[in-house]
């Protein structure tokens, strides 16, 4: 077999493998997905939720960046909301995205 054919077969196999793991992850909540990376301590100090959510918000930003650094849908919320206000980690599934009308009833949509 030629190197091009082997490369194409490898790429196709890798793509199928990645899609199947993404499909599997979509059945998990955000918390279940993140706990696999090292336990509840990934998000919570000593594995316990903080009273105000500030520690958890810092943990989100340490991996995903600040709201100001994100896309246009996140920037307007910088300084006003924490990640968990929209992305309820123990309820939302991996890949689910909150919509504007979850909080806004004026017909706006994400760009």
Curated annotation (Swiss-Prot):
<dbReference type="InterPro" id="IPR012286">
    <property type="entry name" value="Tetrahaem_cytochrome"/>
</dbReference>
<feature type="binding site" description="axial binding residue">
    <location>
        <position position="74"/>
    </location>
    <ligand>
        <name>heme c 3</name>
    </ligand>
</feature>
<feature type="binding site" description="covalent">
    <location>
        <position position="86"/>
    </location>
    <ligand>
        <name>heme c 3</name>
    </ligand>
</feature>
<feature type="binding site" description="axial binding residue">
    <location>
        <position position="87"/>
    </location>
    <ligand>
        <name>heme c 3</name>
    </ligand>
</feature>
<keyword id="KW-0408">Iron</keyword>
<feature type="binding site" description="covalent">
    <location>
        <position position="63"/>
    </location>
    <ligand>
        <name>heme c 2</name>
    </ligand>
</feature>
<feature type="binding site" description="covalent">
    <location>
        <position position="100"/>
    </location>
    <ligand>
        <name>heme c 4</name>
    </ligand>
</feature>
<feature type="binding site" description="axial binding residue">
    <location>
        <position position="44"/>
    </location>
    <ligand>
        <name>heme c 1</name>
    </ligand>
</feature>
<feature type="binding site" description="covalent">
    <location>
        <position position="40"/>
    </location>
    <ligand>
        <name>heme c 1</name>
    </ligand>
</feature>
<comment type="function">
    <text>Involved in electron transfer to Fe(III). Probably involved in one or more pathways of anaerobic respiration.</text>
</comment>
<keyword id="KW-0349">Heme</keyword>
<feature type="binding site" description="covalent">
    <location>
        <position position="43"/>
    </location>
    <ligand>
        <name>heme c 1</name>
    </ligand>
</feature>
<keyword id="KW-0813">Transport</keyword>
<keyword id="KW-0574">Periplasm</keyword>
<feature type="binding site" description="axial binding residue">
    <location>
        <position position="77"/>
    </location>
    <ligand>
        <name>heme c 4</name>
    </ligand>
</feature>
<feature type="binding site" description="covalent">
    <location>
        <position position="60"/>
    </location>
    <ligand>
        <name>heme c 2</name>
    </ligand>
</feature>
<keyword id="KW-0479">Metal-binding</keyword>
<feature type="binding site" description="axial binding residue">
    <location>
        <position position="104"/>
    </location>
    <ligand>
        <name>heme c 4</name>
    </ligand>
</feature>
<dbReference type="Pfam" id="PF14537">
    <property type="entry name" value="Cytochrom_c3_2"/>
</dbReference>
<feature type="binding site" description="axial binding residue">
    <location>
        <position position="90"/>
    </location>
    <ligand>
        <name>heme c 1</name>
    </ligand>
</feature>
<feature type="binding site" description="axial binding residue">
    <location>
        <position position="64"/>
    </location>
    <ligand>
        <name>heme c 2</name>
    </ligand>
</feature>
<feature type="binding site" description="covalent">
    <location>
        <position position="83"/>
    </location>
    <ligand>
        <name>heme c 3</name>
    </ligand>
</feature>
<dbReference type="InterPro" id="IPR036280">
    <property type="entry name" value="Multihaem_cyt_sf"/>
</dbReference>
<keyword id="KW-0249">Electron transport</keyword>
<feature type="binding site" description="covalent">
    <location>
        <position position="103"/>
    </location>
    <ligand>
        <name>heme c 4</name>
    </ligand>
</feature>
<feature type="signal peptide">
    <location>
        <begin position="1"/>
        <end position="25"/>
    </location>
</feature>
<dbReference type="GO" id="GO:0046872">
    <property type="term" value="F:metal ion binding"/>
</dbReference>
<keyword id="KW-0732">Signal</keyword>
<dbReference type="GO" id="GO:0042597">
    <property type="term" value="C:periplasmic space"/>
</dbReference>
<protein>
    <recommendedName>
        <fullName>Tetraheme c-type cytochrome</fullName>
    </recommendedName>
</protein>
<feature type="binding site" description="axial binding residue">
    <location>
        <position position="34"/>
    </location>
    <ligand>
        <name>heme c 2</name>
    </ligand>
</feature>
